[in-house]
């Protein structure tokens, strides 16, 4: 009979997620993970198989939570479409402000992973592409609604505008990670909103 796990797997995933988010995949060693999780190597391997599988689970957890939060904002039918997108940018800006350390943001685990791994890891690239498509589909529906209702003036294709908004959000994350101050990233968001109007 297998021994029951003596740790909280959800808490371990959250801790691993924050560690990968702060350090990146390559810069996080199995030893680092054992240390922050308070587990020995065999416990980590028994629970998660290896560092890569732990990373994939942590990334999935991050994407599920982040995308669900963004889609919840976009699904607020109490607000006009343009205000839902403004609320989404406000959430992104607030998250960047909350996750600053030493003048630099942590960015976004999804964006960080795209830059670090997507070009050389097809499985991770597919995970990231599916997540981006979920967010783009939600944005596209809101933009289409806003165009129909007249509160989004741009006549460009909603799918193109959704990809644009996603790219701006990624750019905000990278700028914050590079040390851009609040005024700079707020201006980026405001410029994107102007492009939609």
Regions from the PLM with identified roles:
Residues 1-7:
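N-terminal intrinsically disordered/low-complexity leader segments
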Residues 11, 19-61:
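Helix-turn-helix
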Residues 51, 58, 62-66, 77, ...:
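Hydrophobic/aromatic residues within well-ordered alpha-helical segments
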Residues 83-87, 105-106, 120-148, 160:
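Amphipathic alpha-helical packing segments from all-alpha helical-bundle domains
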């Amino acid at each position: 009979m297998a021994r029951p796990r003596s740790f909280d797997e959800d808490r371990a995933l959250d801790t691993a997620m924050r560690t990968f988010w702060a350090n990146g995949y390559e810069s996080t060693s199995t030893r680092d993970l054992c240390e922050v999780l308070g587990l020995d190597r065999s416990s980590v391997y028994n629970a998660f198989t290896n560092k890569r599988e732990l990373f994939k689970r942590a990334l999935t957890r991050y994407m599920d939570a982040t995308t669900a939060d963004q889609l919840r904002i976009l699904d607020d039918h109490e607000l006009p479409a343009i205000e839902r997108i403004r609320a989404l940018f406000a959430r992104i800006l607030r998250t960047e402000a909350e996750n600053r350390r030493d003048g630099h943001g942590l960015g976004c685990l999804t964006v960080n992973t795209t830059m670090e791994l997507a070009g050389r890891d097809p499985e991770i690239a597919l995970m990231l592409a599916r997540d981006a498509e979920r967010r783009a589909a939600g944005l596209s529906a809101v933009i289409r609604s806003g165009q129909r209702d007249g509160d989004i003036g741009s006549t460009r294709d909603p799918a193109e505008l959704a990809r644009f908004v996603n790219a701006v959000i990624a750019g905000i994350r990278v700028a914050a990670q590079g040390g851009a101050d609040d005024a700079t990233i707020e201006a980026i968001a405001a410029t994107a909103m102007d492009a939609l109007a």
